[in-house]
Curated annotation (Swiss-Prot):
Entry's family note: Belongs to the eukaryotic ribosomal protein eL30 family.
PROSITE patterns: RIBOSOMAL_L30E_1, RIBOSOMAL_L30E_2
Source species, domain of life: Archaea
UniProt-listed NCBIfam families: PRK01018.1 (NF002172)
GO molecular function: RNA binding; structural constituent of ribosome
Descriptive protein name: Large ribosomal subunit protein eL30
Classification via Pfam families: Ribosomal_L7Ae (PF01248)
One of the GO biological process terms: translation
Cysteines paired by S-S bonds: none
Length: 104
């Protein structure tokens, strides 16, 4: 994969559709409307466990971002913390391929 996660995330935010936030992402994850999930390293463990459990049932890839929620928020161009990003439509990005490649 030639581009970094940050580059793919910026392409995703520009051309795709995402949901920011744990509650909204969990809700869509339970209904199978999310294609992938990005989780920051600072997300509470109980919430991270919930996301991992639901994603395994639906075979939805998860990327564990090594930075904090504040760093992920900054990457998203937000002035606040973003702990979870739900990918609804990847647009022109290849972020789902990137996530699957990293998992292998």
């Amino acid at each position: 994969m030639s581009q970094s996660f940050e580059g793919e995330l910026k392409t995703l935010l520009r051309s795709g559709k995402v949901i920011l936030g744990t509650r909204k992402t969990l809700k869509l994850l339970k209904t199978g409307k999310v294609k992938g999930v990005v989780v920051s390293s600072t997300l509470r463990q109980d919430l991270k466990d919930d996301i991992m459990t639901f994603s395994k049932f639906s075979d939805i890839p998860i990327y564990l971002y090594k930075g904090s929620g504040y760093e992920l928020g900054t990457l998203c161009g937000k002035p606040f913390m973003v702990s979870v990003i739900g990918i609804v439509d990847e647009g022109e990005s290849k972020i789902l391929e990137f996530i699957k490649e990293v998992k292998q």
